[in-house]
Amino acid sequence: MLIKHLQEHFFRELTKTEHLEKIKEGTLPYNRLMSYYKCAIMEVETKFKVLNEQFSLHYDENPIEAIKSRLKSPDSIMKKLRKKELPFTTDAIEENITDIAGIRVVCSFEEDIYKMADCLLQQDDVTLIERKDYIKHPKESGYRSLHLICLLYT
């Protein structure tokens, strides 16, 4: 009975407007950061769709089979920060986690992967930070892919 009373009291206190406002204030910087990454995903997806369309017009081919994107979940971000013994702040996230947003571009042919990567990297608002070529150097598991970590200027 006492535990139930304490739970109800705790819930009433937490859901008071002033507490909810503090929670919103605390999560606002994180939500802004995630919104930035969502917009970056949309922008890069659009870049690839435009490239695919240009290839269709000029070369009568569509090198891109599929485009999929993802935003790392808050739980996954927190686990990564904990593993690195870093605080849960937007600064720590921005400075230490490079895979918050990800886009997978699937091409039918290996040479198309490199063509698309080159076309993306030739754009003025995209800067390559790191390249991991698991096609030329597959992982022991057989995994083959080209990873590009890029900075996007918006």
Regions found by a protein language model. Name each.
Residues M1-N96:
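Charge-rich, low-complexity segments
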Residues I97-D99, G142:
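Short flexible coil/turn linkers enriched for glycine and charged/polar residues
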Residues A101-C107:
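Short cationic amphipathic helices and targeting signals
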Residues C107-S108, I113:
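Mid-length scaffold segments of soluble, non-membrane domains
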Residues Y114, V126-I149:
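Beta-rich nucleic-acid/ligand-interaction surfaces
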Residues M116-Q123:
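Short amphipathic alpha-helices in soluble, non-transmembrane regions
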Residues Y153-T154:
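Conserved small/polar residues in nucleotide/adenosyl-binding loops
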